[in-house]
């Protein structure tokens, strides 16, 4: 079991501990539960889906990286496939506050970058901030997304974001988590190709500036993140954050990164290079390359 889970695990009910123990035994537990695993946990504990998601939130929050606030938020995104994806907030010392990742963004990106097609619900241990409510409004599940909070009745996103402004107001038809492929040729080594593939999946209907980041760890594992724009612009999630979300949730740490590649267009209206390289250097990675999409 990864050490970060030990404290939260010890506080779970005995029957949930017993059912989870073989799942969490792997140090690199992927911070997700398949539909089959969810069903097994429900049977072992007698909990329904909502109660089980609430019970698992401490494990999701244990994935938080909060050296600035020490305020850990956990989220679980429930995919229409039946898979549940953990998420947690992340802060980066030495970077800017704008690079911060919120727990809801983490769980949603985890699902999206894992190939999930849409979300049915998201469970969070604290009320989503306005930033996250706007981020969620970019999803193809839209205002129908169900939000579950401890001690409250579940409500749709529309109840948390009345009179919402979103992609439909800008006549955007392709939404976040819809399948997208921008068709750039995969060239270069494996890490470069992973970055280009991530750029091909970008959701960037507002700037037309595709980008992707791939991080290579010392053991050869590669984590890729795609750019995810938002109709309100500021809640946009950069591609580096997508890759860092996966790296963190899969049990790796920043010192494990040995090389990074950013893929983007040289003449794009928005450029990720400066922010990406600055944040990576703050995390201790200095081997950073850029490949140009063509």
From Swiss-Prot:
The keyword rRNA-binding belongs to this UniProt entry's keyword annotation: no
Short name of any one Pfam family annotated for the protein: dCMP_cyt_deam_1
Highest taxon listed in the record's lineage: Bacteria
Binding site for substrate: 89-91
Keyword Metal-binding: yes
Top EC class of this enzyme: hydrolase
A Gene Ontology cellular-component term: cytosol
Cofactor(s) for this UniProt protein: Zn(2+)
Binding site for Zn(2+): 102, 129, 132
Recorded catalytic activity of this chain's protein: cytidine + H2O + H(+) = uridine + NH4(+); 2'-deoxycytidine + H2O + H(+) = 2'-deoxyuridine + NH4(+)
Active site: 104 (proton donor)
UniProt cross-references to InterPro entries, sorted A to Z: APOBEC/CMP_deaminase_Zn-bd, CMP_dCMP_dom, Cyd/dCyd_deaminase_Zn-bd, Cyt/Deoxycyt_deaminase, Cyt_deam_dimer, Cytidine_deaminase-like, Cytidine_deaminase_bacteria
EC number: 3.5.4.5
Listed GO biological process terms: cytidine deamination; deoxycytidine catabolic process; nucleobase-containing small molecule interconversion
Quaternary organization: Homodimer.
Domain notes: Each monomer is composed of a small N-terminal alpha-helical domain and two larger core domains that have nearly identical tertiary structures and are related by approximate two-fold symmetry, but lack homology.
Family per similarity comment: Belongs to the cytidine and deoxycytidylate deaminase family.
Name of the protein: Cytidine deaminase
């Amino acid at each position: 079991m990864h050490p970060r889970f030990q404290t939260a695990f010890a506080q779970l009910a005995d029957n949930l501990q017993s059912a989870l123990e073989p799942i969490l035994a792997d140090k690199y537990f992927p911070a997700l539960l398949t539909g089959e695993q969810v069903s097994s946990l429900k049977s072992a504990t007698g909990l329904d889906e909502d109660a089980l998601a609430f019970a698992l939130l401490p494990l999701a929050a244990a994935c938080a990286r909060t050296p600035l606030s020490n305020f850990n938020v956990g989220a679980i995104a429930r995919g229409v496939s039946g898979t549940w994806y953990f998420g947690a907030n992340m802060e980066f010392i030495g970077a800017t506050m704008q690079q911060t990742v919120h727990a809801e963004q983490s769980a949603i990106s985890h699902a999206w970058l894992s190939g999930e097609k849409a979300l049915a619900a998201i469970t969070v241990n604290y009320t989503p901030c306005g930033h996250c409510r706007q981020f969620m409004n970019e999803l193809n599940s839209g205002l129908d997304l169900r939000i579950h909070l401890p001690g409250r009745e579940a409500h749709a996103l529309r109840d948390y974001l009345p009179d919402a402004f979103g992609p439909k107001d800008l006549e955007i038809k392709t939404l976040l988590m819809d399948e997208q492929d921008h068709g750039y040729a995969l060239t270069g080594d494996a890490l470069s190709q992973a970055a280009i593939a991530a750029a091909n999946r970008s959701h960037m209907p507002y700037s037309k500036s595709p980008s992707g980041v791939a991080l290579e760890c010392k053991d050869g594992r590669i984590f890729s993140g795609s750019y995810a724009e938002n109709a309100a612009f500021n809640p946009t999630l950069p591609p580096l954050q997508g890759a860092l979300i996966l790296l963190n949730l899969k049990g790796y740490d920043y010192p494990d990164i040995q090389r990074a590649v950013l893929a983007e267009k040289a003449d794009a209206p928005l450029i990720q290079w400066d922010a990406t390289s600055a944040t990576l250097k703050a995390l201790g990675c200095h081997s950073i390359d850029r490949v140009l999409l063509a």
